From Swiss-Prot:
<feature type="binding site">
    <location>
        <begin position="30"/>
        <end position="33"/>
    </location>
    <ligand>
        <name>ATP</name>
    </ligand>
</feature>
<protein>
    <recommendedName>
        <fullName>Chaperonin GroEL</fullName>
        <ecNumber>5.6.1.7</ecNumber>
    </recommendedName>
</protein>
<feature type="binding site">
    <location>
        <begin position="478"/>
        <end position="480"/>
    </location>
    <ligand>
        <name>ATP</name>
    </ligand>
</feature>
<keyword id="KW-0143">Chaperone</keyword>
<dbReference type="GO" id="GO:0140662">
    <property type="term" value="F:ATP-dependent protein folding chaperone"/>
</dbReference>
<keyword id="KW-0413">Isomerase</keyword>
<dbReference type="InterPro" id="IPR018370">
    <property type="entry name" value="Chaperonin_Cpn60_CS"/>
</dbReference>
<feature type="binding site">
    <location>
        <position position="494"/>
    </location>
    <ligand>
        <name>ATP</name>
    </ligand>
</feature>
<dbReference type="InterPro" id="IPR002423">
    <property type="entry name" value="Cpn60/GroEL/TCP-1"/>
</dbReference>
<dbReference type="InterPro" id="IPR001844">
    <property type="entry name" value="Cpn60/GroEL"/>
</dbReference>
<comment type="function">
    <text>Together with its co-chaperonin GroES, plays an essential role in assisting protein folding. The GroEL-GroES system forms a nano-cage that allows encapsulation of the non-native substrate proteins and provides a physical environment optimized to promote and accelerate protein folding.</text>
</comment>
<feature type="binding site">
    <location>
        <position position="415"/>
    </location>
    <ligand>
        <name>ATP</name>
    </ligand>
</feature>
<dbReference type="GO" id="GO:0005737">
    <property type="term" value="C:cytoplasm"/>
</dbReference>
<keyword id="KW-0547">Nucleotide-binding</keyword>
<comment type="similarity">
    <text>Belongs to the chaperonin (HSP60) family.</text>
</comment>
<dbReference type="InterPro" id="IPR027409">
    <property type="entry name" value="GroEL-like_apical_dom_sf"/>
</dbReference>
<keyword id="KW-0067">ATP-binding</keyword>
Length: 546
């Protein structure tokens, strides 16, 4: 077992602070409209260039074990803030550094860390209450575009694309980000339900130019059974042939004689049919089939509920205005299911989302919700190089998450001004070391605004003082042009959720660091050098061995 080094009290906290400082110094240069880029060496390939705080934080590993522990804790704050709110990683890092720095000074001078923490927690809760009072709901496309633009580092084109996507598919709709073939950004909106299963045979294709199978006004057979024999589905095929309408088969799988017969009859023009595998796996597949059944007004043919393919009738089939299938995806447009049943299914999924404790399950449930309640929008990001593409795609992902956060909880004025406004309204009657904790938060809360001003080349102290002294709630500093403006009027806004989570996470990690009394870390041992092999030249005589 490796030897361990133990550090106590001020010695431990000072080394932790050094790690926090180094990480914050690297991350904070990216903050604001005039933030700078950070160039990151990769173990292979070209270096990456980014202005994304969490991307910078994730790359940092320090040589000193204790300093690295401090850096890793703050890195975790940046990641958690990004996961929960999609943005605010740099704000959280700058706040954590500011709070830890102020707190360390007071604790070194003799303040009780536990009492200080209690005061910090009370101040944070009060500031968040005031932030909520200062917030307003996002009402229109213009405000959504403003939030997205700021989160995408002032890229107005990305902002307008996200706003347009959200307008078309709704706040519960699926918006995905993909790489474009060229250098231009574009938005594609898929109406209806799309799932990631393509045709089982290219012989089902009806449009050879686009390699798509398009079925107009089709019946839809849904089953969780594997179809291997033609006799299983013969009665249904005869029924759909008499109606003169095409048939889409969605099953666990279709193989052997069944698939061959379908393809041959399709090529002969006897049947207008297409077949795809059911989406998802296991229990999730069953639920997704039920979603499609609800949307199309059909039933899932399943032996679990006593239905077999041989006994199924036309009445069990779903219907839609159109189905488009390519090699990767199937899209059902304008399903003929009852609106009331669809709404009931949506409400059921919402309840499951609220009840689940698994992030993965929540994500999959939200995807199902979006497919039922809205369409699917795809933002295609274009760039001239692979390095630019990665950086731009990261920005679009951040902007998308931040925009969803804004729609969820509302917006506050941006540029770090909302935190200062909220803190100014808080008046707590505390005493002793609790009061010190409260004052630490009040002093550190201006750190984001100061950093934004500093990155733009302005005097941070003067800017922060001017904002603090002005009584107008919407008054703030526009770092892009150096003017003091009405932040809402100028569209300089942040999601409330981003500001709230950044502050909560920053205070949480700072409290942990300030109440740390000992650190235990491994002592790095110098590995012995490899032995010199030059003296083994005499082994050359072994070359004759084959």
């Amino acid at each position: 077992m490796a030897s361990k080094e133990i550090n106590f009290s001020d010695s431990a906290r000072n080394k932790l602070y050094e790690g926090v400082r180094q990480l914050a110094d690297a991350v904070k240069v990216t903050m604001g409209p005039r933030g700078r880029n950070v160039l990151i060496q990769k173990s292979f390939g070209a270096p990456s260039i980014t202005k994304d705080g969490v991307s910078v934080a994730k790359e940092i590993e320090l040589a000193d074990a204790i300093s690295n522990m401090g850096a890793q804790l703050v890195k975790e704050v940046a990641s958690k803030t990004a996961d929960a709110a999609g943005d605010g990683t740099t704000t959280a890092t700058v706040l954590a550094h500011g709070i830890f720095k102020e707190g360390l000074r007071n604790i070194t001078a003799g303040a009780n860390p536990i009492e200080v923490k209690r005061g910090m927690d009370k101040a944070t809760a009060a500031i968040i209450d005031e932030l909520k009072k200062l917030s307003k709901k996002v009402n229109d496309k213009k405000e959504i575009a403003q939030v997205a633009t700021i989160s995408a580092n002032s890229d107005e084109n990305i902002g307008s694309l996200i706003a347009e996507a959200m307008e078309k598919v709704g706040k519960d709709g699926v918006i995905t980000v993909e790489e474009a073939k060229g250098i231009n950004d574009e938005l594609n909106v898929v109406e209806g339900m799309q799932f990631d299963r393509g045709y089982l045979s290219p012989y089902f294709v009806t449009n050879s130019d686009k390699m798509e199978a398009v079925l107009e006004n089709p019946y839809i057979l849904l089953t969780d059974k594997k179809i291997t024999s033609m006799k299983d589905i013969l009665p249904l095929l005869e029924g759909t042939m008499k109606s003169g309408r095409p048939l889409l088969i969605v099953a666990e799988d279709i193989e052997g004689e069944a698939l061959t017969t379908l393809v041959v009859n399709k090529l002969r023009g006897v049947l207008n049919v297409a077949a795809v595998k059911a989406p998802g796996f296991g229990d999730r597949r069953k639920e997704m089939l039920k979603d499609i059944a609800t949307l199309t007004g059909g039933s899932v043919i399943s032996e679990e509920i006593g239905k077999t393919l041989e006994s199924a009738t036309i009445a069990d089939l779903g219907q839609a205005a159109r189905v488009v299938i390519d090699k990767d995806n199937s899209t059902i447009v304008d399903g003929k299911g009852s609106k009331d049943e669809v709404n009931a299914r949506v409400a059921q999924i919402r309840t499951q989302i609220e009840a689940t404790t698994s992030d993965y399950d929540r994500e999959k449930l939200q995807e199902r919700l979006a497919k039922l309640s809205g369409g699917v929008a795809v933002i295609k990001v274009g760039a001239a190089s692979e390095v630019e593409m990665k950086e731009k795609k990261d920005r679009v992902d951040d902007a998308l998450s931040a925009t969803k956060a804004a729609v969820e909880e509302g917006i506050v004025i941006g540029g770090g001004a909302a935190l200062i406004r909220a803190a100014a309204k808080v008046k707590l009657e505390l005493s002793g070391d609790e009061k010190i904790g409260y004052e630490i938060i009040k002093r550190a809360i201006s750190a984001p605004l100061k950093q934004i001003a500093q990155n733009a080349g302005f005097d941070a102290g003067v800017v922060a003082n001017n904002v603090e002294q002005n009584g107008n709630e919407n008054f703030g500093f526009n770092a892009a042009n150096g003017e003091y403006v009405d932040m809402f009027a100028e569209g300089i806004i942040d999601p409330l959720k981003v500001a709230r989570i950044a502050l909560q996470n920053a205070v949480s990690v700072s409290s942990l660091l300030l109440t740390t009394e000992a650190t235990i870390s491994e002592i790095k041992e110098d590995k012995p050098a490899m032995p010199d092999m030059s003296g083994m030249g005499g082994m050359g005589g072994m070359g004759g061995m084959m």
